[in-house]
């Protein structure tokens, strides 16, 4: 028997699994688990940032990597994420993709303004023991901010006391997005709901739609398919 909460949505992946284990049987859905109060209720807030006309025109000539580079190193965007994280009540997880270009700069913007709130930076080189310590501390906190890479905190971390998730970096992976959402669905003693903030970047001009906005549209389709 093979069990998973997240197929990647491709026909090839499904056929490979069926070849190994037999027909795929979906025994429940995220929405059904929410309705049965087995997991926390989830609210999704999509925040679309409109970029300047000059940037929109320039982005037409960019490849995907150039667009990502611009997004994660955009000072105004990072300030927006910082202000958002600091404005939220409850424990907040800020997920990013690139450590040096995005994760560390975000943490350096957030941490000095936390006051008495605890803040943590987690990435691939963070010791497993330190990650577990952060997880344990967060369970006892009510207003901490964790700035963590997708690779370290999108899967395998069980934090029941997590109230907010911010997608600070764009991601086109169905599995990564759903598994990241799963971090916020655990029920806690004082937690019955969680909120996901999905940040997108609108650089459309004429008939052109930028790469990461296309990926955002795909994420919205996933949310609709999962009835989130």
For each feature predicted by the language model, list its residue ranges.
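Loop/turn-to-beta-strand initiation segments
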Residues: 1, 91, 141-145
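Post-DEXD/H (motif II) to motif III coupling segment of the RecA-like Helicase ATP-binding lobe
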Residues: 1-45, 223
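Short hydrophobic segments within beta-strands
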Residues: 3, 93-97, 122, 168, ...
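A short beta-strand-to-loop transition that corresponds to the Sensor-1 phosphate-sensing loop
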Residues: 3-7, 97-99, 148-151
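Short glycine-/polar-rich loops that comprise or flank the Walker A/P-loop
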Residues: 13, 21-24, 40-43, 115-118, ...
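Conserved interdomain hinge at the start of the Helicase C-terminal
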Residues: 57-97, 101-112
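Conserved RecA-like helicase motor-core motifs
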Residues: 93, 107, 111-132
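Conserved RecA-like P-loop NTPase helicase motor core
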Residues: 124-225
């Amino acid at each position: 028997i093979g069990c998973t909460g997240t197929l990647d949505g491709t026909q090839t992946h499904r056929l490979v699994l069926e070849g190994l284990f037999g027909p795929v049987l979906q025994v429940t859905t995220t929405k059904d688990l929410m309705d049965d109060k087995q997991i926390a209720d989830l609210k999704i807030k999509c925040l679309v940032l409109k970029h300047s006309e000059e940037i929109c025109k320039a982005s037409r000539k960019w490849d995907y990597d150039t667009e990502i580079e611009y997004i994660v190193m955009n000072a105004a965007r990072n300030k927006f994420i910082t202000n958002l994280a600091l404005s939220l009540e409850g424990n907040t997880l800020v997920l990013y993709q690139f450590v040096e270009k995005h994760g560390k700069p975000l943490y350096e913007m957030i941490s000095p303004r936390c006051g008495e709130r605890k803040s943590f930076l987690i990435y691939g080189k963070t010791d497993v023991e330190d990650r577990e310590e952060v997880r344990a501390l967060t369970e006892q906190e009510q207003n901490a901010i964790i700035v963590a890479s997708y690779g370290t905190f999108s899967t395998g971390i069980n934090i029941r006391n997590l109230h907010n998730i911010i997608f600070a970096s764009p991601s086109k992976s169905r599995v990564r997005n759903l598994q990241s959402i799963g971090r916020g669905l655990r029920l806690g003693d004082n937690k019955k709901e969680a909120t996901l903030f999905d940040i997108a970047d609108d650089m459309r001009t004429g008939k052109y739609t930028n790469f990461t906005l296309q990926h955002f549209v795909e994420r919205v389709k996933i949310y609709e398919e999962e009835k989130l």
